[in-house]
Amino acid sequence: MKRKIIHVDMDAFFASIEQQDNPEYRGKPVIVGGLSGRGVVSTCSYEARKYGIHSAMPMYMAKKLCPQGIFLPVRRKRYEEVSEQIFRILYDITPFVEPVSIDEAYLDVTHVDKNPEDIALEIKKRVKDATGLTVSVGISYNKFLAKLASDWNKPDGLMVITEDMVPEILKPLPVTKVHGIGEKSAEKLRSIGIETVEDLLKLPQENLIELFGKTGVEIYNRIRGIDERPVETMREIKSIGKEKTLEKDTKNKELLIQHLKEFSEIVSEELIKERLYCRTVTVKIKTADFAVHTKSKTVDKYIRFSEDIYEVAKGILEEWKLEQYVRLIGLSVSNLSPVKYEQLSFLDKRLVKVIKAGNLAEEINKRIGKKIIKKGSELLKDNK
């Protein structure tokens, strides 16, 4: 039986919420993101996109392109509230929902006794009625094609890609439209004269494997309409991280290390909450020329406390020869494994106390409606 996969993608989500909440912004270029000189665009309205503005663009550049635009800070809590409304609608249709981000998801409706197009129209109507927002929906028999379809007629689009349309419908597309081909891979392909999917279809599988390794097989299949990836209702957490764009470029390692200490606490809290260990710690920097560099270290035993993560991250940065000024610093952990209490050593029993204390603090704060119980590091930050 051919699967029936739906890809749901909200249109300019953050900016659309701002326009919905503030009617005076409707029809005007709205740009949401970090408002400092070093901030970047999170998203922008379709009116702003006409000026060449796009996500991840430095905010100062967006202001140059559209000085008359409405520039707004990110209201994460508000966007999460709206996202919850939307996902409640999706889960009401099927339990087989894979959240991709705050504003994007896949649904497997193979066993829903309803035409996929009717389901798509229902989603669009219910989201519009509940939030006032538009959503683009793609329908196909696998995830790659469903996502491609949702992007076809944005905003407020609805597109179906059937088996008999492939590969013809894909041929004119740039190679960057193929899942698994980013800008760097596209550059590699352009260097050998391959710019479109039609060009790519002419390459034998062996050549794609030479270029991309195992991913070459997946790319070979996808451009022929084959993608066996399931809709994952419980997505595996592969990494946890935190990063920050600095107010001012710096080479000051002490300042950067202080940020890593703060990030270690945030990452540790998330590991404990998810009941996970990690073995690999990665430090990321973005230099003044926007080049991204990462260095990782894998330790012998699984760790999860902030002091352990911090020591590894600090060691990585101390050995790093910084030749350029740094504009962004980040920390992430990976190589994760579930916590198993029965395997904890005597010293590790502190984890149980931390989890219990953390959960109790969360519950009290939740019931009171305020964050009255804080960590020592939070109190120090508040007093600065």
From Swiss-Prot:
Q: Could you name the domain of life of the organism this protein comes from? A: Bacteria
Listed name of the protein: DNA polymerase IV
Tell me where it mainly resides.
cytoplasm
Q: How is the cofactor bound?
A: Binds 1 magnesium ion per subunit.
List, in alphabetical order, the Gene Ontology terms for molecular function in this entry. DNA-directed DNA polymerase activity; double-stranded DNA binding; magnesium ion binding; oxidized DNA binding
Q: How does it assemble?
A: Monomer.
At the highest ranks, the source species' classification is: Bacteria, Bacillati, Bacillota, Clostridia, Thermoanaerobacterales
Q: What is the effect of changing residue 297 to A?
A: 20-fold lower dsDNA-binding compared to wild-type
Q: What class of enzyme is it?
A: transferase
Q: Explain what the record says happens when changing residue 180 to V.
A: 20-fold lower dsDNA-binding compared to wild-type
The domain comment in this protein's record states: The catalytic core consists of residues from subdomains of the finger (11-75), palm (77-161), thumb (163-224) and little finger (240-335).
Phenotype upon changing residue 9 to A: Nearly complete loss of primer extension activity. No formation of correct or incorrect base pairs with the DNA template at 37 degrees Celsius
Q: Identify the PANTHER family for this entry.
A: DNA POLYMERASE KAPPA, DNA REPAIR POLYMERASE UMUC / TRANSFERASE FAMILY MEMBER
- What is any one GO biological process for this UniProt entry? DNA-templated DNA replication
Cofactor(s) recorded for this entry are: Mg(2+)
Query: What happens on changing residue 46 to A?
Result: Decreased primer extension activity compared to wild-type. Forms correct, but not incorrect base pairs with the DNA template at 37 degrees Celsius
